[in-house]
Amino acid sequence: GVYSDHAAFNSSYAAVYWPWLQIYDAVNGVKVWCPPSGFMAGVYAYSDNTTEVWFAPAGLTRGHLTQPIKAEYSPSLGERDLLYGNGNAVNPIATFKQDGINVWGQRTLQRLPTALDRINVRRTLLYLEKVLSTAVRGLLFEPNDAATWTRLRRLVTPTLESLKTRRGLQDFKVVCDSTVNTPDVVEQNMVKAYIYVKPMKTVEMIQLNFVITAQGSSFTEAIF
């Protein structure tokens, strides 16, 4: 679609990509320009099929585009930084001489600088909400007591442990006990559980620092 700087976009459930891409229409024998949305659906699907939903659908490994002939415009490094930062949230599609056309960003449209301004984090939470909601359905209409709270913790922990092992989470903690399920909560026929997660961050900058050491000195002395 068309992005307008007058629209107050602010959501972690959406993302914007730019520029448009050109493909060959074999039916009509012409080249046409298309918005990147369709290509991005393919990138997301490829990323999910080859890795996991918490891996960013971007970069040379999962964000490489092979179908487009060319991009409408290839933003420079400075332009990409401007699109991606400084309060903006446009994911650039960049063209590199050796690596072709690649998705070079994974920001959501959330303006508040939290973990949810990244696509991989939002998709991780969507996955957890779906899987864990299904896992605890069997507890509905069970007695609302400590035994049920323990069962809930045991039901959700394996999935969280699995994500931690598979590089989806750095760490987590599940709280479902009398501290959150107070008499008032129980009186409402409700169970509350708080799942604290430390989502996995992605590498978006690489800094290489070169240090020249004097002849005769050891690297141990030079490292600081």
Each model region followed by its residue ranges:
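Structured, hydrophobic secondary-structure cores that serve as assembly/anchoring elements
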Residues: 1-224
